[in-house]
Amino acid sequence: MVNLPPDSRRYLAMHKRRVCRPFHLRWLLPLTLRGNVKAWTWATRLAVVAIGLLTAVYTGSPWMAAVAFLPAMTWNWHNPVMVDMVGMAWALATALVALEGWWWLAIPMALVGGTIRETVPVWSAIYAWHPVLLVGLVPVAVRWAMRHGSDTWTDHNAELVARPFMAGQLFHRGRWRDPLLMVTPWAGLIAGVVVMAGGVFDARGGAAQVGVALAAGYLPLLIATDSVRIYQWAAPVLALACVTVLPTWALPLVALSIVFNPWRGPGT
């Protein structure tokens, strides 16, 4: 029996009824997987594995496959009726295709990514450090203009969805400076942030790429009710920073710190 939080119940219902924004933007997986919980479970868990493998390719280090054990990934493993892991895996695959120069494939993949989750094209562009992949926001804009439904899943949820800034402030009040929520779930990957502060990271987009990835990860918390599973979309970029600046012998330690992190938290 898998967990079905409110978001999951929305996705399961989307093939037969309209749902509210932003969930109605994420229509591809609900259309294809429909109400089949087993199919959702397979899709999400295969995506978690793929994220580890793709990050290893992206960074050039097999040790960075350990990102699959970050708390955001393990939370989705146990709550698989979600679009996040498939979206992240797709964003990373799109970036890798773009980095190979196969734009004839990368651009259609970016467009498909925009139907999985509205943030997928943004993260594809960050991972590849190339703005062309933002073309994937076109289907997001088209879908945004289409009719959406109301939210009736909980008594208070409709108001939270209608007023996202209020929701973000409500759920993060007094928690912005909590290191157990905002920092320690990264484990050894936090070295990527230290590198950015030192200004010595010179791979791909360099410190600017790390900064943009962190901004794209943390700023949505202003309008979100979750934390870790949102900002850890930046994991591949921080992993790349670690591989770039740390000595080779330190990478297994980073991987072990991720897998056995005692301050990982629940991952939400």
Residue ranges and their predicted role:
Residues 1-12, 19-32, 117, 153-154:
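Extracytoplasmic catalytic/substrate-binding loops of multi-pass membrane glycan-assembly enzymes
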Residues 12-31, 43-47, 179-186:
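Membrane-proximal lumenal/periplasmic loop motifs of glycosylation machinery
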Residues 125-202, 210-214:
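Membrane-lumen/periplasm interface segments of specific transmembrane helices
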Residues 86-109, 237-241:
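Specific aromatic-rich, kink-prone transmembrane helix
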Residues 92-95, 104-128, 218:
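Membrane-interface alpha helices of multi-pass inner-membrane proteins
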Residues 27, 41, 45-53, 62-89, ...:
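Aromatic- and kink-enriched transmembrane "portal" helix at the membrane-lumen/periplasm boundary
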Residues 83, 183-247:
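Membrane-water interface signatures at transmembrane helix termini and the short loops
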Residues 131-140, 247-262:
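Signature aromatic-anchored transmembrane alpha helix within multi-pass, membrane-resident enzymes
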